[in-house]
Structures are given as structure tokens and as C-alpha cells.
């Protein structure tokens, strides 16, 4: 039985999506942090492939797993979710519910009514306006400021609706965690959230052993039939527009004219056929891995020579943290969130996106310039890689993340 003196932390999770995105990595690391604190943990997992609700204990942690809903996300079925909490979770001043998915204002409100003594914590892993606006927070501010005019635009109307829901969530909960300074500024300057409610806690990652000798790296490459003289440029993540995939492919087409010994590895869900056909002429130089489990992806971090993160928007990217942990020299955009993680000529080469349009040749040209700098200088590659590793150790270790959440929980 849990101690009456300990806080009871209920971490809400979604089984299917957590196996494929950064929220799953975050929850894994958060649970590691909480295990090192004087708290009791309950991992609440929705949409599990099983026929009934199950409650068990594992490794000193309580687990409540809930089967899949007939349709929609678990937060769309908030009435059922609330019944589950009323059945299995007694209200208490020591309870802290940690929400990681959005938008779910109805669920938060219903839980506030059924469990008025319990605290609520909302960790922002995504702001829904960032994808359609390609991370342009200045445009968001203009849309919100000119609300009446913006409502006449279909896309802007949808954005305002999601902003309203996110704002409602922030107002309902007791604390909001943002992962980057950029999100903190949006919450304070555009959403107008009380700063005392906001906690800036960047993601952290447990330190792992990584292959750092050329001999070990080459042995791993042999298993994947990659020549030791070939320079591997690694992109990891969803192959979508807001992740900057088209800018990378266009840049790689240009790079091949100067560098014949390079390979682009795309570790993520496969591109549609009509997109692949546009880049058929470079297909022998591009490796598509499909979605990879973390264990397999780590091998590519070890084999790669350069990491590229061309996203228009991120929320403290775990791909970025993992690349830094492995000491990769990184080329990144100055997109929303990324500009808080990386400093140009420090732990990465940061390239400006420029205008956020579908055919932005300037962005691709900037990527070409940055990648050329690294490919042309082993010294620069080593320097950026060392700085990346130092940045990980200083800012993104599990210890720093644990201290942030301990500070937050102590404030309750």
C-alpha cells in the first residue's frame, strides 16, 4: 500500500502512439526520474491491446492499463476515462495527474469536478498551431491579435479554436510544463498565462554508452554494407513537410554534384510514392529505413557522420538530444524550439529557414552551405561533435530533468 505521506503521481500515457513518438521516450525518462524521488507512481496506459481493464504492480510501480476505445483518442472518450478514475483513484490532496496529450479540456474539467482535491499537471509536447503555421510564432501572434479578421480564414479559424482549447487547459491545471524558452514566451506573451504557473523543464535522457572509436564504428557499418569512406548524413523522424524533409532532399540533390561519397539515411515512416518519384534520380544514394525502434535507431546514431534536423518546429527534440549524446556534428534549422536547443558554431551549425513557403529554395541552399562546411572539414566536424556532447551533459541529462520535476512537485 502506498504511504499516506507520499505524493501519488498518475502519469497518463497512450500505448499506440507512445511507441512511435517523443512522448513515449519522455514518459520512459520521466518514470525513471520519479523512481528516484520519494513519491508513489501509477502509470495509466490507454488503448492497450487487451480485452479488459487491468491493475498490477511492476518494479515498485502501479500500472492501470485500459483497453482500446472503439473510436477516437482516449481524451475524446473523456466521460469513460473519468469513470475509470472515479473507480480506481480516490481523490486526495497528495494526487498529481500528469497529462501529456492535447487538446483535452473536457477531460481536465471533468477530473477537476470529480477530484477537486487532486493537482493537475500539463506537459506541453505539442502546440497544434505549430504544424500548419510551420512554427511561425509571429504569425500566430498576428492571428490572435486580429481575431475577428482571422475567423474569416478557414485555417486560421481552426488554429484559433485549438489555441482556445490549449488556453483552457492551461487555465484549468495547477501547473504547466514547457520544454523550451520559445514555448514559455508563447504562453506568457500570446496565451497570457500566469508566469507563476509555468515551469520550464527541458527533456532529459539517461546517459548510455556509445560507440566512439573508428574501429567499432566501421565494424557496425560492415554489418549494414556501408563503406567506411562514405559519409552518412542522418535524418530521424517523421518524413513530413513541417519536419523539413523536402528541404533536406533538395539540398542533398545539390550536394551530390560536389560530393560523390555521401549517403542520406532517412529513419522514419516512408514517403508517399508520388514524392519518391520526384527524387528517383538520387534513390541509390538515399536509404529509407522506415520507422525504427529506439534500439535499432541507436545503431544509426553510431554509424552516422552528420545529423541533420531541418524541422520548422520542435518541442525539445529527443532526436536532437540523442544526436548530441552520441557526439554527432549537427546541422539544424532555426525553427521554433530548435533555436533554443542549438547555438550556431557551438553545439551545431544553425541555418536560417527564411520565408516559410512550400518552395523555399533559400532554406535548401542554407542547408547545402552548412553541410558543405562539415563535409569539407574533419576538424570542424570533430569540434561541433565535441560541443554537442558537452551540451548534452550540461543541459539534457536525466539528472537535470529530475531536478526540474522535483522542484515542481515540491511547489505543490
List each language-model region with its residue ranges.
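Short hydrophobic beta-strand element within catalytic cores of glycosyltransferases
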Residues: 329-332, 339-342
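Nucleotide-activated donor-binding/catalytic signature segment of Leloir-type glycosyltransferases, i.e.
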Residues: 275-298
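Aromatic "clamp/platform" in nucleotide-sugar-dependent glycosyltransferases that forms part
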Residues: 312
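A short helix/loop element that forms part of the nucleotide-sugar donor recognition site in Leloir-type
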Residues: 211-226
Amino acid at each position: 500500500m502506498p504511504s499516506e505521506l507520499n505524493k501519488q503521481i498518475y502519469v497518463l500515457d497512450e500505448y499506440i502512439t507512445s511507441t512511435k513518438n517523443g512522448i513515449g521516450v519522455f514518459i520512459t525518462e520521466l518514470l525513471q526520474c520519479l523512481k528516484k524521488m520519494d513519491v508513489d507512481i501509477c502509470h495509466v496506459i490507454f488503448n492497450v491491446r487487451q480485452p479488459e481493464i487491468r491493475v498490477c504492480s511492476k518494479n515498485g510501480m502501479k500500472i492501470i492499463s485500459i483497453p482500446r476505445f472503439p473510436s477516437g483518442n482516449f481524451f475524446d472518450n473523456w466521460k469513460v476515462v473519468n469513470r475509470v478514475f472515479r473507480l480506481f483513484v480516490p481523490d486526495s490532496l497528495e494526487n498529481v495527474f500528469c497529462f501529456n496529450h492535447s487538446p483535452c479540456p473536457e477531460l481536465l474539467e471533468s477530473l477537476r469536478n470529480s477530484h477537486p482535491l487532486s493537482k493537475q499537471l500539463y506537459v506541453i509536447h505539442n502546440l497544434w498551431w505549430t504544424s500548419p503555421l510551420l512554427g511561425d510564432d509571429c504569425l500566430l501572434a498576428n492571428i490572435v491579435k486580429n481575431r475577428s479578421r482571422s475567423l474569416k480564414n478557414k485555417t486560421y479559424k481552426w488554429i484559433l479554436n485549438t489555441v482556445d482549447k490549449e488556453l483552457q487547459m492551461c487555465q484549468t491545471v495547477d501547473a504547466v510544463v514547457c520544454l523550451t524558452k520559445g514555448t514559455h514566451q508563447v504562453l506568457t506573451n500570446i496565451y497570457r498565462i500566469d508566469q507563476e504557473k509555468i515551469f520550464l523543464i527541458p527533456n532529459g535522457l539517461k546517459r548510455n554508452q556509445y560507440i566512439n572509436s573508428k574501429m567499432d564504428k566501421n565494424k557496425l557499418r560492415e554489418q549494414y554494407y556501408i563503406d567506411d569512406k562514405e559519409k552518412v548524413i542522418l535524418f530521424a523522424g517523421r518524413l513530413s513537410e513541417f519536419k523539413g524533409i523536402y528541404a533536406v532532399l533538395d539540398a542533398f540533390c545539390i550536394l551530390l554534384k560536389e560530393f560523390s561519397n555521401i549517403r542520406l539515411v532517412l529513419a522514419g515512416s516512408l514517403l508517399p510514392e508520388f514524392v519518391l518519384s520526384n527524387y528517383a534520380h538520387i534513390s541509390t544514394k538515399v536509404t529509407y529505413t522506415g520507422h525504427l525502434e529506439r534500439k535499432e535507431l541507436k545503431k544509426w546514431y553510431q554509424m552516422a557522420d552528420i545529423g541533420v534536423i531541418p524541422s520548422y518546429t520542435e518541442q525539445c527534440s529527443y532526436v536532437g538530444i540523442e544526436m548530441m549524446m552520441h557526439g554527432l556534428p549537427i546541422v539544424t534549422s532555426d525553427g521554433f524550439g530548435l533555436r533554443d536547443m542549438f547555438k550556431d558554431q557551438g553545439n551545431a551549425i544553425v541555418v536560417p529557414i527564411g520565408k516559410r513557403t512550400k518552395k523555399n529554395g533559400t532554406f535548401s541552399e542554407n542547408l547545402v552551405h552548412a553541410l558543405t562546411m562539415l563535409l569539407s572539414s574533419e576538424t570542424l566536424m570533430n569540434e561541433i561533435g565535441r560541443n554537442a556532447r558537452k551540451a548534452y551533459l550540461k543541459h539534457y541529462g536525466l539528472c537535470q530533468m529530475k531536478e526540474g520535476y522535483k522542484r515542481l512537485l515540491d511547489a505543490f
